[in-house]
Amino acid sequence: MPPDTRINKEIMVSWIRKNLLLVLTVSSVVLGALCGFLLRGLQLSPQNIMYISFPGELLMHMLKMMILPLIMSSLISGLAQLDARQSGKLGSLAVTYYMFTTAVAVVTGIFLVLVIHPGDPTIKKEIGTGTEGKTVSTVDTLLDLLRNMFPENVVQATFQQVQTKYIKVRPKVVKNNDSATLAALNNGSLDYVKASVEYTSGMNVLGVIVFCIAIGISLSQLGQEAHVMVQFFVIMDKVIMKLVMTVMWYSPFGIFCLIMGKILEIHDLADTARMLAMYMVTVLSGLAIHSLISLPLIFFVTTKKNPYVFMRGLFQAWITALGTASSSATLPITFNCLEENLGVDRRVTRFVLPVGATINMDGTALYEAVAAIFIAQINGVHLSFGQVVTVSLTATLASIGAASVPSAGLVTMLLVLTAVGLPVKDVSLIVAVDWLLDRIRTSINVLGDAMGAGIVYHYSKADLDAHDRLAATTRSHSIAMNDEKRQLAVYNSLPTDDEKHTH
């Protein structure tokens, strides 16, 4: 074998060994899709499809199991090691970035859907009318957001969140007892809808984050007094990340089963793709522009660094998000990519990423804006400039309120449609392709969070380094003072000449 060939082979083997997990994860996505399409011809029963998806279900369980301890330990340990000024700077930088990129994503989506015009009334005739949709109120949703930010019971927030539900109520008393009124009462004509604030299952991520931020900042203000408590959360954070690394080696098999099972679940794949092809092209084009042009441009302008080199280090997180369709479930892998591959300070990642996984939903905001205007187009409704602005603002706010769980975009979509008076039931028409779009927009959400962490780190690196130098100086001074005190104590314990003479 020639020397050059042998060297190239060694380099390739070395690269594969170093990036084995990444290679396995990418292969699992490709093989999962391929096997899914090949097995569609067998027309497997729902029970058999469930068995195929089961290893993927276990992966989701394992990743979600890590979310609560990871958010608590990462946020508290990260903020506790910063002073209040640094925490405020990190927070303001992160929120500014989140709001700006979300607005850019929405504008991109609206521009494309108006130019491409994927919606046509004939599509609705082919697909049929939608099923009855849920009632939803923008005001009630915003109130729920605030209620969830400040939970009345922190323990309850770990497994339940507040949600306004709407129930039909039949009047118990009527003014007129004539036959017409009684008939209307019996057939439900006098029924009215009443809003009821209830608890639904699912972790209140926003409430947990707000509570952990408060605890972290309070611990940082206590200083040395809270040292033991801070170390507890730092060590807990390291333990969770060690567990995550173990789970990551199972993730390729889990993602393979998730993708294959999801493709097998879809009915009439070819017909759905044909009828909603232009809608999918519009959404995917918007997501591609946002992830390959807008975000890299923002990153380059703010940091003067090559964004594509930075994105290469995030590939593992991007692929995992594609497989799991959950920003929160991908959070541990995103931590690992930023800290190990790209050298971002853990104090930045531990604060910026958990918040970003909850409120920064660029892909979701873009998708909601496109879907809302697409539904208007298939209903033959022409939206005025004011209504388009309303769509953009509502899509931005709705994406912030979206929980970082699979298909949350469909739920918040109801807000956008209600805001401009479009039929809510037509959301069901685009559900058929949401399984694919959900995965891709989630991967864009994760990419946006990670690039935000990189930008925040760029602007806060000098402050963090200065804080570290000050802490090191203070620690050295403290050690010197303790040594001096020990020497003085030893000197004072020695007997004097008079004491020696007396003895």
Swiss-Prot record:
Gene3D superfamilies: Sodium:dicarboxylate symporter
Ranges that cross the membrane: 19-39, 59-79, 96-116, 199-219, 239-259, 281-301, 369-389, 400-420
Glycosylation, residue list: 177, 187
GO molecular function, one term: neutral L-amino acid transmembrane transporter activity
PROSITE patterns to which the protein is assigned, alphabetical: NA_DICARBOXYL_SYMP_1 (PS00713), NA_DICARBOXYL_SYMP_2 (PS00714)
One GO cellular component, as annotated: plasma membrane
Statement: the UniProt record of this protein carries the keyword Glycoprotein: yes
Membrane topology, from the record: Multi-pass membrane protein
InterPro entries: DAACS, Na-dicarboxylate_symporter, Na-dicarboxylate_symporter_CS, Na:dicarbo_symporter_sf
Pfam families referenced in this protein's UniProt entry, alphabetically: SDF
Gene Ontology annotations of biological process type: L-glutamate transmembrane transport
Principal localisation: membrane
Spans within the Extracellular topological domain: 117-198
Compartments (UniProt record): Membrane
Alphabetic keyword roster: Glycoprotein, Membrane, Symport, Transmembrane, Transmembrane helix, Transport
Domain of life according to the entry: Eukaryota
Annotated family: Belongs to the dicarboxylate/amino acid:cation symporter (DAACS) (TC 2.A.23) family.
Chain's role: Transports L-glutamate and also L- and D-aspartate. Essential for terminating the postsynaptic action of glutamate by rapidly removing released glutamate from the synaptic cleft. Acts as a symport by cotransporting sodium.
Entry protein name: Excitatory amino acid transporter
Lineage: Eukaryota, Metazoa, Ecdysozoa, Nematoda, Chromadorea
Gene that this sequence comes from: glt-1
